[in-house]
């Protein structure tokens, strides 16, 4: 009987953990949706509020149904516990009533639910006052002034190349992340004098040896190594196009200014993810006037 109860508790704990994870993922998704909509776009902000409320209602309903299903599975044991308590009361009328196993499970579930709600509330406060939220608000204002908004790129180590791939796609240039990485490494290897002086061994502080530089270029091609300004400089020469990097707390950076084409525009975010810096692409802002005319 004790083994059965342990299994039921494990099932309930697993369900609560899964619900907690799904709530966390939903909050991250909602934050991404909020970041993508400029603060001054009232129409889209209103629609966003409705969409967020709908997502939260649907998840809450789903979680209630799953908890109810689990409760039904344990209903039989609860009835057995209740009968056992009643028999005990008949035999030992003066004995104080005991808390049933089902009641203990309900109390434990309520405590876990309260803890989860407190964590969500703390996370919401942190999001609204933290560096990530402030950075997103500043970037939204900068982009809105240009009639642009952020286009999210996955944070998988390829984000800089992925953002450029997206920008090039808008110009009908079908270069993939893999192709951009390969061409970057090849350009840096054939122009090593332009890049080698800026690369140092983090352990010794010495400039990279030719062997270390070769491995650096191999990693560009064969791993999800994060790209930075050296790689952007190489890509601007490869594409013969300027690349403009917008950021929240500093003026824009433009590499490849010597080229006369319209720049590819990236957004650099220092606080977007806990693991470090991140690049996103941009897209044209669809304002309320355009929507009303369509």
Curated annotation (Swiss-Prot):
Interacts with the eukaryotic translation initiation factor 4F complex. InterPro entries: OTU_dom (IPR003323), OTU_OTUD6 (IPR049772), Papain-like_cys_pep_sf (IPR038765), Peptidase_C85-like (IPR050704). The active site is at residues 156, 159, 278. GO terms for biological process: proteasome assembly; protein deubiquitination; proteolysis. It catalyses: Thiol-dependent hydrolysis of ester, thioester, amide, peptide and isopeptide bonds formed by the C-terminal Gly of ubiquitin (a 76-residue protein attached to proteins as an intracellular targeting signal). The lineage of its organism: Eukaryota, Metazoa, Chordata, Craniata, Vertebrata. GO terms for molecular function: cysteine-type deubiquitinase activity. It comes from Mus musculus. Residues 220-230 are annotated as: Variable-loop. Residues 148-285 form the OTU domain. Transmembrane segments: none annotated. It holds the Pfam family OTU. This is Deubiquitinase OTUD6B. Residues 268-278 are annotated as: His-loop. Gene3D superfamilies: 3.90.70.80. PANTHER family: DEUBIQUITINASE OTUD6B (PTHR12419:SF21), OTU DOMAIN CONTAINING PROTEIN (PTHR12419). Disruption phenotype: Mice are sub-viable and die between embryonic day 18.5 and shortly after birth. They show intrauterine growth retardation and a high percentage of ventricular septal cardiac defects. The modification N-acetylmethionine is found at residue 1. The keyword Iron-sulfur does not apply. Deubiquitinating enzyme that may play a role in the ubiquitin-dependent regulation of protein synthesis, downstream of mTORC1. May associate with the protein synthesis initiation complex and modify its ubiquitination to repress translation. May also repress DNA synthesis and modify different cellular targets thereby regulating cell growth and proliferation. May also play a role in proteasome assembly and function.
């Amino acid at each position: 009987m004790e083994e059965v109860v342990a299994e039921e508790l494990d099932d309930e704990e697993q369900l609560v953990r899964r619900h907690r994870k799904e709530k966390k993922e939903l909050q991250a998704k909602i934050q991404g949706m909020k970041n993508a909509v400029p603060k001054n776009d009232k129409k889209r902000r209103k629609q966003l509020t409705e969409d967020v409320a709908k997502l939260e209602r649907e998840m809450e309903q789903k979680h209630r149904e799953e908890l109810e299903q689990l409760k039904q599975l344990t209903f039989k044991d609860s009835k057995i516990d209740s009968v056992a308590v009643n028999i005990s009361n008949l035999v030992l009328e003066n004995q104080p009533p005991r808390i049933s196993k089902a009641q203990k499970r309900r109390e434990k579930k309520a405590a876990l639910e309260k803890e989860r709600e407190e964590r969500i509330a703390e996370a919401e406060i942190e999001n609204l006052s933290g560096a990530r939220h402030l950075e997103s608000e500043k970037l939204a204002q900068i982009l809105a002034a240009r009639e642009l908004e952020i286009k999210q790129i996955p944070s998988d180590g390829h984000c800089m190349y992925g953002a450029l791939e997206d920008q090039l796609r808008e110009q009908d240039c079908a270069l993939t992340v893999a192709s951009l990485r390969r061409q970057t490494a090849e350009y840096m290897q054939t122009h090593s004098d332009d890049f080698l002086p800026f690369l140092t061994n983090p352990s010794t502080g010495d400039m990279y040896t030719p062997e270390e530089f070769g491995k650096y270029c191999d990693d560009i091609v064969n791993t999800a190594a994060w790209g930075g300004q050296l790689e952007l400089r190489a890509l601007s020469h490869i594409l013969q196009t300027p690349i403009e990097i917008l950021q929240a707390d500093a003026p824009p950076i433009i590499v490849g200014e010597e080229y006369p084409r319209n720049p590819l525009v990236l957004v650099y975010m220092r606080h977007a993810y806990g693991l470090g810096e991140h690049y996103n692409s941009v897209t044209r802002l669809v304002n309320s006037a355009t929507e009303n005319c369509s």
